[in-house]
């Protein structure tokens, strides 16, 4: 925790909930108030997170850790933008040749039974990391197992599986409506393995109305939590606009040409 004049010591909590499997993952909900913990032993548990104290509480066990007869291996995961769905990718065990991307409905009375397999990947293709991007879509990497040692790829190993990311276009929607499109985002000749960058959300903003939302000044300037970026800039005419409006706020996008003439307008 950080105050205006102090960096606090690390906060350590021992959950003591999964002790056998390696490769633990922690994934925070976009609003920062929940955290999901998964591991390769098939463990999945969600916690409340207090952004003011840095403490976790109220664990909700979704899947216990498996120590034998393994039937699931959670490799990566991410929340939907609305925080009500959780997407997990799995890896395969030695006697299984298939990995998956699975959607869970966190509002369901029985979350394990809400599992919806969006796609299965058969060896030599292996499911990798999945991440929520600033455009509110999910992007997923895959590894193509060409042989030992796996990394790096030889120049000759290029295909649709390792030169594209898969995309969930509408991750707030359940089932087929989320529009999972495998190997649909071309990387311009770059190739994927199991991972994707881990990019912290520095645009989350303050927890409005919370006990730690107390910093004031003599001349306080009230601003909305607005995120907006254009890339590349400058461009050749082809560019991407990413934006995130303040909660429950609308806006308008207007693009002007070099003479100041409006050439595009859209309500957001």
Can you annotate each of these PLM segments?
Residues 222-268:
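C-terminal outer-membrane/trafficking sorting elements
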Residues 1-49, 55-62, 70-217:
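Beta-propeller fold recognition
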